[in-house]
Amino acid sequence: MLLHHTIIDGRLYARGSSDNKGSLLSRYIAVDAYQKVLGKLPINIKFVAEGEEEIGSPHLMDFIRDNPEKIQSDGIIWEGGSKVVNGPLVVHMGVKGVTTFEIVCKEPKNHSNPVWRLIWALNSMKNADDYITVDHFDDSIAPLTEYERNFVLNNDYDEEAMKKMNGIDHFVRDLTGNALKEKLYTEPSMNIQGLYFREIDPVTGMPKSAAVKMDIRTVPNQEPEELMRQLRNHLDAHGFEDLEIIEGHSTLPYRGKPDSLLAKAVIKDVAEVYGMPADVHLMIPGSCGMARVVKATGIPIVHYGCMDDASRAHAPNESVDLDHYIKGAKLSVLVFQNFATMD
């Protein structure tokens, strides 16, 4: 799985070493170690290796629908996860959704510039304070339940570590404390992935068409189809009827709870392996196909892995700390043991 790698100062450098082949491999290692040292596994373990997560897992639900007997289980450990260097392991119970799309401006009339037209449209969709200004965009957002609010407000959030990891000196709107944590759980985000144009007109010196590729990280109750309808209505209402929206892939958001037997086993065993309590989150800003799997199967999911905040996932010099990696495999061994005896 990791064909070419380099080890420097206790870190293994290789593409996919942290996100997320490395975390998957650590669980294979845990199974192999358990069988060689302790013998027969105390539980049945199934592996599902799915290679389309980065494009929205378009065929995952087909596989689940066609193979219910292969999926049925008492719990799912989902792909990868992270920890703070010299800090706690992060355990996630859910994810934000993602909806991707393009907005295209084709050959505007009167020699107008399609790039500027897109910029003006984008300016109507989000303001300088990071609020999404698409009409009715947040109408359906599910507020935190009393349980979720208490959990979020009582949960530690290492702001300094997050600022250091992301190379910033403050958060958007200068948020801090509970307001910052609530934003993470209850606000969607809108991101520009790239803006491009095609074919410069030799007469006007302007591109003939332009497009912007975007994504929205969604929170519970936001549905991709409804968001695209709201965006279409917003553009039309602001004079951009000529702009075309091309929908891309999407995954749904899911806000879980740490109350399943699997979650309790993982959280307990993290403290034993790492010598400090797990940093538990109901959801993370990232996205994957977790929500659709939970909705289709009802199986509780826990998300942990072998990355840390120096791993540089999806980037050059991706790496994993070998000590953390070994502990991650040990954690899985303990989870196998303890989950088998919980009721």
What are these regions (language model features)?
Residues 85-86, 134-209, 217-230, 238, ...:
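An extended, acidic, His-containing surface patch that forms the Zn2+-binding/catalytic region
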Residues 62, 109-132:
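A short core secondary-structure module
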Residues 125-129, 232-241:
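A common structural junction motif
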Residues 29-36, 120-124, 216, 334-337:
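Short glycine/serine- and small hydrophobic-enriched flexible loop segments
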Residues 39-114:
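Histidine/acidic-residue-rich, glycine-tolerant segments that coordinate divalent metal ions
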Residues 1-46, 327:
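Active-site metal-coordination/substrate-binding segment of hydrolases
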Residues 102-106, 124, 213-217:
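Residue-level recognition of well-ordered beta-strand positions that form the cores
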Residues 18, 107-110, 216-224:
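A generic structural motif
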